[in-house]
Amino acid sequence: MLMLENSLANTSQATDTWINHHDSSSAAFSKKKKHDWQGKPYHPISRHYRECFGTKVFKVSVSVAETCPNREGLNGSKICSFCDEWGSAAYHLERDKPLSEQIKINREAIRKRYRAERFLVYFQAYTNTLGKVQKLQDWFDAALMEKDVVGIVLGTRPDCLPSRVLKLFQEYSERSYLSVELGIQTLDDEQLNFLSRGHDSQCSLDAIDKLKEIPGLNVCTHLIFGIPGETDEQLIETARVLSEKKIDGVKLHNLHVLQGTPLEQIFVKGDFAPLSLEEYTRKVALFLEYLDPSVAVHRLAAVASRWNELLAPEWNREKMRPMQFIEDYMRNNQMFQGRLS
């Protein structure tokens, strides 16, 4: 049952660009009747970045955090059922190298492939706010000193936002673009238990509120679709609640099975079946129709970074086909983000 009752009651150039944008764009964007979404039926994150920085911006993923509360056994929690040994890190991360080298290697690869000129350093794997704040500050400073880096993106959990971390976020959001990607996954407590997250939905809602109190901070929530017990009504209500919370972005994933995860054992026993691409597409389209159009969509579906670990579904081996399938489905059915919000 949803726990929503309380929720309802480097560069000065980058800094200047972000501050000027932050004051006006969100309100103005939500009032538009015809959205300039580059031909897509949803608000793509690329559009948000172009509005912020006036050009294309690409994420440079790095891996410096080494663990998370669940792996440390805090509060008696277990490893999340879907998480592999890499802690959600992308396959290409040079995690054994110093931060500056990771940034350089991954930045140059992206620059060469996409002719990119501006970058956000993405602290992706594990829980980046678990540990000493001084270490987090050192990471931020090192990232912002790098050439062509215009901001920071950081992934963390709702239960790892102590006041000292929030204070640090406030300091850096005042002088640079800072986005926090919050892994709430679902707002249903039974489903959170299935995932072995170690926190409840109220913790997620409280975390969103704390982050939204920080001026200039961009807040993106991660969601997983296809958890046992999920209903259409739940997805609609989640879209409505997150819209009312005025989050800035969402990143959507389908629950998929990787080798070496607790979910593998559940899958092998026949107690879990992942969604087909068709059913997942229907769920995503439904969710987006109730999501405020000002919310940027960072990702439409998960993609397995290490194909040799993927057990199911097979379509998670691909990135472009699921995205195109979802876009075509929405266009063919005259659906678009925010139509029913």
Indicate residue ranges for each PLM-predicted region.
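Acidic (Asp/Glu)-rich catalytic clusters
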Residues: 110-112, 140-147, 169-177, 209-214
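Core AdoMet radical
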Residues: 86-106, 110-133, 148-161, 177-204, ...
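Hydrophobic faces of well-ordered beta-strands that scaffold small-molecule active sites
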Residues: 58-62, 119-121, 152-154, 178-182, ...
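Distinct, well-ordered alpha-helical segments
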Residues: 133-141, 162-171
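Conserved C-terminal portion of the radical SAM core fold
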Residues: 202-262, 278-301
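Auxiliary Fe-S-binding modules of radical SAM enzymes
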Residues: 2-47, 56-58, 249, 256-341
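Structural recognition of alpha->loop->beta junctions
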Residues: 80, 142-149, 237-251, 321-336, ...
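N-terminal [4Fe-4S]-dependent radical SAM core
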Residues: 2-120
